[in-house]
């Protein structure tokens, strides 16, 4: 689960990570009021959306006066902000973060993330922080410091010193930086985060360190332990179809293609998307209904995919195990009759009660295209578009 920058900074404050003074605003007047309360200019007016690259997209402005703060707030609030992470459709800006400007001596990069390859935690840092960190990582990866932390032993003093020395911090800033990184690690672990990112982490002219930006991603599977964090979820920032799918415990991710697919099992779903691409088409989604899906869950999954206007055909790929083919077929028939099928639907089923499942589909009167195997299914759905 992603949260907004202003929410992430509130968490930072709770754990003793220094951030600029500021406040969230939902209107131009609120933004001006926050700016007035900061006691002087410049102030920074920042769009609040769940995407990076806001500065390059025009969503971050430095205001030198109240007049500029008002103007920038009016320009950013309500705009459709397009960044490399939003896609061409962009995101509407519905809230702002207004913060006190800082005297920046140096911009750095700092993050903590889960490294699934080593089943550990990695601290990443760089002296090249700021808007071009992606370019730095791609073209000069040697400038990225990586320190692996064993979660069983936790953060140790030598990890803190290794990162601090790697960032080239002056001696006067090392103690404060070590405290910041230690607190950040504590926040990461206690809140079941998958990513914490500060870009930029700044070194001020008086050798202080401060998080000028904040990104926090929380493991959605751990939210049952964090009822307070669940309240930070902003459904307006999420895909409406993904929100709908989550209500029915369906694993759904909306993509850019035009072939919808329904599969049971994450691995089989990814293989299905690969073979759709191999056949010359593009998957419109990832949809795993799970092994324990009921007919109702299947019905909801099919209805969600049919509501996606990009979808021009659907591929259903089911291997019946815990989810029997007859149960799946009943769900498909119910959903199709309720929604009305106006696009080609290719079905490939194997496994438990497959003959009964095929019988249910055949007797339904629906115009479904049967496939003998996965390759045949992909070729038929690609040809049907």
Swiss-Prot record:
Pfam families: ATP-grasp_2 (PF08442), Ligase_CoA (PF00549). Pathway: Carbohydrate metabolism; tricarboxylic acid cycle; succinate from succinyl-CoA (ligase route): step 1/1. GO terms for biological process: succinyl-CoA metabolic process; tricarboxylic acid cycle. Substrate binds at residues 264, 321-323. Its cofactor is Mg(2+). Residues 9-244 form the ATP-grasp domain. PROSITE patterns: ATP_GRASP (PS50975), SUCCINYL_COA_LIG_3 (PS01217). It catalyses: succinate + ATP + CoA = succinyl-CoA + ADP + phosphate; GTP + succinate + CoA = succinyl-CoA + GDP + phosphate. Its EC number is 6.2.1.5. Binds 1 Mg(2+) ion per subunit. ATP binds at residues 46, 53-55, 99, 102, 107. Mg(2+) binds at residues 199, 213. It comes from the Bacteria. InterPro entries: ATP-grasp, ATP-grasp_succ-CoA_synth-type, ATP_grasp_subdomain_1, Succ-CoA_synthase_bsu_CS, SUCC_ACL_C, Succ_CoA_ligase-like_bsu, Succinyl-CoA_synth-like. One of its GO terms (cellular component) is cytosol. Keywords: ATP-binding, Ligase, Magnesium, Metal-binding, Nucleotide-binding, Tricarboxylic acid cycle. Belongs to the succinate/malate CoA ligase beta subunit family. Succinyl-CoA synthetase functions in the citric acid cycle (TCA), coupling the hydrolysis of succinyl-CoA to the synthesis of either ATP or GTP and thus represents the only step of substrate-level phosphorylation in the TCA. The beta subunit provides nucleotide specificity of the enzyme and binds the substrate succinate, while the binding sites for coenzyme A and phosphate are found in the alpha subunit. Heterotetramer of two alpha and two beta subunits. HAMAP family: Succ_CoA_beta. This is Succinate--CoA ligase [ADP-forming] subunit beta. It comes from Desulforapulum autotrophicum (strain ATCC 43914 / DSM 3382 / VKM B-1955 / HRM2). The lineage of its organism: Bacteria, Pseudomonadati, Thermodesulfobacteriota, Desulfobacteria, Desulfobacterales.
